[in-house]
Amino acid sequence: MTELLAPVPTPPPPHRPRRWGWLLAVLLLSVLAGVGSLAYRLLYAPNVPAAVDGPAYLYIRRGVGLTALLDSLRQPGVLARPADFAWVARWRGFGTAAHPVQPGRYTLPAGAGNLDLLRLLESGRQDTLAFTLKPFHYLPQLPRQAGRQLSLDTTQLHKLLTNNAYLTRRYGLDTATVRTLFIPGTLRLFWTTPAAAFLDSVAARHRRFWNGRRLAEADSLKMSPVQVAVLASIVQRETAQPTDKPLIAGVYLNRLRRGQPLQADPTLLWPLHGLGTRKRVLNVDKKVDSPYNTYRHKGLPPGPITTPYPQALDAVLRPAHHNFVFFCARPDGSGFSDFSETFAQHKAFARRFQHHLDSLKIRR
């Protein structure tokens, strides 16, 4: 009898690893790592170099678009990778109507990435600068001075300074006296401060200077702040020596009390546009036809001849008390003056000083 045997099962093939799965996983991780690295570089990696000589600033004028801004950022040393910033800016829609470029003066934060820098520029959070207000003799000099430090419209500033109706309504001054509003020193201003706001900031500083004490001191002299500033402008042009300022202020106050003309040489040079350039006053200058000629007209001139520093203003408010009515610069070049009570004494001092100018061949 034949015996039927069950078939012997065939063993399964040996297990082999699925290499394609691993390769796909590795490839996917590599892509994700690359995308993450690219995103980090574009958004967060430092792009603003470390400042070498102090903070770096970015100035953006009104009306500047994205293209002009990117051109300025491509300048050497501004950004490490300007192309990256340009890509991120366009990706976020910066420079469009929804996210316009904000004018201003921005401190570039050292080590900042593109996203932080963009957020700063989008916010318009500019910082202030230290505006240095220097003395000036004539109104047209101020817009030029302001235009060198701020982005304001200098033509508009000049229009405001020469608009009597505006000056009277806003500050109670006119074109002759508006320079008394300006007290040289430092103001904290935005680079984009408009012309009208600039004048308001100057006026605010003026109000802070004229505190209760100074107003009382002016009142004791029977003078207004404007009159104090006019006299202080003359004192400032007469001497740079701090200790002589109260003495010279006392001389002019003595003359005013006695009804004598001030006879201040700097007031002759102002209408001749000679302040800062002329070194000698001649007798012919005393005939100049001007309300600023204090040889021909008694009292104070109609306005200041320069913008006086606080020290000159305080010298008038707190003058030296004496009987001097004359003074003359010393010939030693020290900047000090010799003071006298009589014309005879003064004439001797003046003759000595004139001989000194002659020896130096200073004719004008």
Identify the role of each PLM range:
Residues 2-263, 290, 308-311, 315-323, ...:
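Conserved catalytic or metal-liganding residues and their short signature motifs at active sites
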Residues 263-311:
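Conserved SxxK-family serine transpeptidase/carboxypeptidase catalytic domain
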